[in-house]
Every structure is written in structure tokens, then in C-alpha cells.
């Protein structure tokens, strides 16, 4: 037999083996008899994402198709067999009771080559635990109280700019203005920098904020590859963050840290907390890792605080105004509360008065239910797990787990008339009756959103000052029903939120 024949035979055998391996991977759930859709050969259950369908449309349609069929449905996270949770009882096991078996999110990250991916949201294992412990002190109620006046100052500037826009035209695209408000808040608190995006919509920070959410180094195929073969992608030094965004945030952080250290400047903000963690006397954790932050780690945490903080809060505020514009009775009730609370504070919100904005808090909570900005929670199984009472349903080690919280929030078994905006869903009485995992805009358990307090604070301050002085209603340009951006992982309106605004 010739060498060529041997090589050809070996090649064909290898190809045959790979095809069989490929097929067996994409038949995992079907062979076990677990309900699932037939996967696409490359995209798995994510077929059409960012082109024909948004991420949330995939989660919602999958949930509605399979709910009631068992504790979870089979899913294919690109080429990886994954678990798609259908019951809140299983969500509670994963997020809280069996958290140690589902600690990691399982998203691709590569801090060695892509420093901004070394952020708390993406880190796994001991690296996540160490970083979470480092940052836990930065979002205490005491730290929120320190940052409160800064947020109010920017919010007052925001209402002035908003009023100027209304004076020019009563029809306002609120999404962009709200994003400029939260950009200035986060820029000030995270970097100590006057971003000035309220005055200049093309300010550098605002531009980079936009790009950080829409620009990616990889296309759909590349994203599918790094999520299907994360270890290989790291060995190939693959990166997710676009080069201009990495350069900008690394430069800003280096300059900010150097300026504060050289001039002994203290601002009692998020950046100060990170600098303290960088400069504290060298300590080593029980696992042997340094508990001092590097400049790259500071940049990564500041970046995620900025990118996630401005977008999630501004999106929530925009959808709140969108619903209030369609529900004038609710808007009048929340305005009355805001006016009374602020009047008691001699016209200036203070930290202690925020607890009195009870109905506004219900409005924000209901907005987060209907428009869950992060509509799916991702975890990765760290050891084989049999679902209690369902021996057929086993989550294998290494499997991605998806909890479609946005779809669950619109399940009539959890909320009566689930597509109707009703802040009374979050009255104190109903909240007490409800299991915590039935409302998951910030996740739950040890890996819930560390910035939850800050996000809620800036949204409530901004909304309170806006609603106090302005009435919102729908106009010809208002999109009803809402249409969503197909390219973003987060929930976002497709073409802005146009409302009519007038002073009261």
C-alpha cells in the first residue's frame, strides 16, 4: 500500500471521526429524550441571532414553547449542549441553594490578552471570589451615601438640559438624553471626570459608551467559536474588546490613577476605592493570590461599571417613561409622591428621603419586570447535578445553564396579566408573598449584581427630578408596541423612545 493511500485513509478516518463526534454533540438532548429544538450545525439553538432574531426573542420563544414540559429544556449554546431552565424552583437551586456547583457564568474572557475582559462580571472560580471580596466594600450603603450628592448634582444639570430641549420641541427622544445623563454620572463616580455629554452629545465618553455596546472585535461566527471552544480561543490569544475601546479606557484609567496619586486627591468615589485596593499593604489570600489590584484590573472594573451602569439605568428609565406616558393615572400618582417628598426636603433630594419614594420604587421594579435589561442569567455547571425529583434530568459538568428571567417575568403563572404595566405588582404586601427568584433583574444569590444599589439609586434620582417637573405623553412618533434592537445582548429599543414632554 502506498504512502499516499495510507495518508488518505487516515485523513478520511479522521474526518469521519470528527463528523461522528460533531453529530453526537449536536444530538445530546435528542438521544436522552429531553425536549429541545433541532440545532443549527454551527449556531446551535442561536440560529438567526443578531440578524433575524434578537437574543431576547430567542429566550422568549424557547421558554414559551417548552414551559411545562419539565424542569428544563435542552438547548445548544452554539455548539455546546446547554440547559434552558423552565422552572423557578430549579433557578433557585442553581442561583442560591446549590450555588457552589454553579458559581461560574461561563462567558469567554481572556485577561492576559484582553485586559478589559478581566472584569468581575466575566471572571470565574477563585479569581471571581477574590475580586468580589475586593470590591464588596465599594457598594455599601455608606459608599452610596458618599456618592449621592454627586448623582443629584448631575441630575439637576440633566433636568436643566431636558427643559432646554423641551423648550425647542415638545417631542423628545428620551433614550439618548437619559444615556447622556447616566454617562455623566458614571463618568464622574467611576473616573472622577467631567464627561460633559449632557452639554455635548458627541463628547468622547459618550461616544466610547455607544461604541462599547455596539462594536465588537468578532462577528457572529467568531463569537460562536470563542463560546464553543474557550480554551482553544485563549491559546490562540483571541480577544473580544475592540482595540479603540481598550486603548481609550486603559489610557483614561492610567491618567486618572496617576493624577490622583501624584496630587493626593480624594473624591470618595468608586475610583478611590479601586486605588485603595491597589495601594493597600501587600496581602495574599488563602489561595495564594495577591489581593492588591493591578492597573489592568482597575481598568477592567471601571470599564464594566461604566459600560453596564450607564446603559442599564438609562434603558430602565426610558422604558419607565414610555409606560408612564401610556398610563397617566400612574404617572400622576408617582408625580404627586415625588413632589411631596422633595418639598419636605426643602426642594433638594437627600439620601434619607429616598426611602419615602415608595411608589416610584414600585414603578422602577415593574419596569424591570416588563423590560428586563439583562433578560437571561448564564451559569456553568461545575459538577454533575441531578435535578431533585427528576432523575432523567442531569446537568453535566461543564454545561452552560441559561435562566430566561425576562421570559419568566411575563409568565401568567407568576404575574396576573403579565404584559400589563402594574406597579401594584410590587406593593410591600405582594413582595412579601413572592419568592425572590420570581423577580431577577439583578440575579439572586452570591453572584447577584454587585452594583444593584447604585443602579437603582441613579435611576430613582433621575426619574424623581424629571417626573416632578415634566408631564410625559405619547405622540405620533412613539412606537407602540415597542420594537427591540436585534444586535444587542441587552434589551434596547430599536429606534429610540419618542415622547411628548411639557412642564407641569
Swiss-Prot record:
Domain of life of the native organism: Eukaryota
EC number: 1.14.-.-
A Pfam entry, by short name: p450
Topology in the lipid bilayer: Peripheral membrane protein
Residues passing through the membrane, by range: none
GO cellular component: a single term: endoplasmic reticulum membrane
Keywords from the named record: Endoplasmic reticulum, Heme, Iron, Membrane, Metal-binding, Microsome, Monooxygenase, Oxidoreductase
Cell compartment(s), UniProt: Endoplasmic reticulum membrane; Microsome membrane
Cofactor: heme
GO MF term list: heme binding; iron ion binding; monooxygenase activity; oxidoreductase activity, acting on paired donors, with incorporation or reduction of molecular oxygen
Database matches in Gene3D superfamilies: Cytochrome P450
PROSITE patterns the record matches: CYTOCHROME_P450
Residues the record lists as binding heme: 449
Entry keyword Endoplasmic reticulum: yes
Annotated function: May be involved in the metabolism of insect hormones and in the breakdown of synthetic insecticides.
Family stated for the protein in its record: Belongs to the cytochrome P450 family.
UniProt protein name: Probable cytochrome P450 6a21
Source organism of the structure: Drosophila melanogaster (Fruit fly)
Gene expressing this chain: Cyp6a21
Amino acid at each position: 500500500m502506498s504512502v499516499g493511500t495510507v495518508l488518505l485513509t487516515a485523513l478520511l478516518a479522521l474526518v469521519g471521526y470528527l463528523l461522528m463526534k460533531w453529530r453526537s454533540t449536536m444530538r445530546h438532548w435528542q438521544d436522552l429524550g429531553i425536549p429541545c429544538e433541532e440545532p443549527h450545525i454551527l449556531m446551535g439553538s442561536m440560529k438567526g441571532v443578531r440578524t433575524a432574531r434578537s437574543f431576547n426573542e430567542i429566550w422568549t420563544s424557547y421558554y414559551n414553547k417548552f414551559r411545562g414540559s419539565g424542569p428544563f429544556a435542552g438547548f445548544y449554546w452554539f455548539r455546546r449542549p446547554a440547559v434552558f431552565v423552565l422552572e423557578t424552583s430549579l433557578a433557585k437551586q442553581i442561583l442560591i441553594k446549590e450555588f457552589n456547583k454553579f458559581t461560574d457564568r461561563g462567558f469567554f474572557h481572556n485577561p492576559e490578552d484582553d485586559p478589559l475582559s478581566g472584569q468581575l462580571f466575566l471572571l470565574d472560580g477563585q479569581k471571581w471570589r477574590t475580586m468580589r471580596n475586593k470590591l464588596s466594600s465599594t457598594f455599601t450603603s455608606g459608599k452610596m451615601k458618599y456618592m449621592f450628592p454627586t448623582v443629584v448634582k448631575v441630575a439637576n444639570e440633566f433636568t436643566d438640559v431636558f427643559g432646554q430641549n423641551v423648550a425647542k420641541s415638545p417631542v423628545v427622544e428620551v433614550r439618548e438624553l437619559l444615556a447622556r445623563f447616566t454617562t455623566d454620572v458614571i463618568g464622574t463616580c467611576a473616573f472622577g471626570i467631567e464627561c460633559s455629554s449632557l452639554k455635548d452629545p458627541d463628547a468622547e465618553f459618550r461616544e466610547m459608551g455607544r461604541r462599547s455596546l455596539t462594536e465588537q472585535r468578532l462577528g457572529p461566527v467568531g463569537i460562536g467559536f470563542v463560546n464553543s471552544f474557550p480554551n482553544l480561543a485563549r491559546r490562540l490569544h483571541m480577544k473580544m474588546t475592540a482595540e479603540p475601546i481598550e486603548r481609550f479606557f486603559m489610557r483614561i484609567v492610567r491618567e486618572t490613577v496617576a493624577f490622583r496619586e501624584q496630587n493626593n486627591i480624594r473624591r470618595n468615589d468608586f475610583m478611590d476605592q479601586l486605588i485603595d485596593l491597589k495601594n493597600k499593604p501587600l496581602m495574599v489570600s488563602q489561595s495564594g493570590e495577591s489581593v492588591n489590584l493591578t492597573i489592568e484590573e482597575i481598568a477592567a472594573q471601571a470599564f464594566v461599571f461604566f459600560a453596564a451602569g450607564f446603559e442599564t439605568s438609562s434603558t430602565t428609565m426610558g422604558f419607565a417613561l414610555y409606560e408612564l406616558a401610556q398610563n397617566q393615572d400612574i404617572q400622576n400618582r408617582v408625580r404627586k409622591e415625588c413632589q411631596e417628598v422633595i418639598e419636605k426636603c426643602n426642594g433638594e433630594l437627600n439620601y434619607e428621603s429616598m426611602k419615602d419614594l415608595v411608589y416610584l420604587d414600585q414603578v422602577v421594579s415593574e419596569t424591570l419586570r416588563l423590560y428586563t435589561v439583562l433578560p437571561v442569567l448564564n451559569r456553568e455547571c461545575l459538577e454533575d447535578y441531578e435535578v431533585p425529583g427528576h432523575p432523567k434530568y442531569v446537568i453535566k459538568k461543564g454545561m452552560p445553564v441559561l435562566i430566561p428571567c425576562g421570559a419568566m417575568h411575563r409568565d401568567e403563572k407568576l404575574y396576573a396579566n403579565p404584559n400589563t404595566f402594574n406597579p401594584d405588582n410590587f406593593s410591600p404586601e405582594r413582595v412579601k408573598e413572592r419568592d425572590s427568584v420570581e423577580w431577577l433583574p439583578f440575579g439572586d444569590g452570591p453572584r447577584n449584581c454587585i452594583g444593584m444599589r447604585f443602579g437603582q439609586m441613579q435611576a430613582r434620582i433621575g426619574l424623581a427630578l424629571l417626573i416632578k417637573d415634566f408631564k410625559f405623553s405619547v405622540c405620533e412618533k412613539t412606537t407602540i408596541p415597542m420594537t427591540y434592537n436585534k444586535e444587542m445582548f441587552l434589551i434596547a429599543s430599536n429606534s429610540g423612545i419618542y415622547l411628548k414632554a411639557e412642564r407641569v
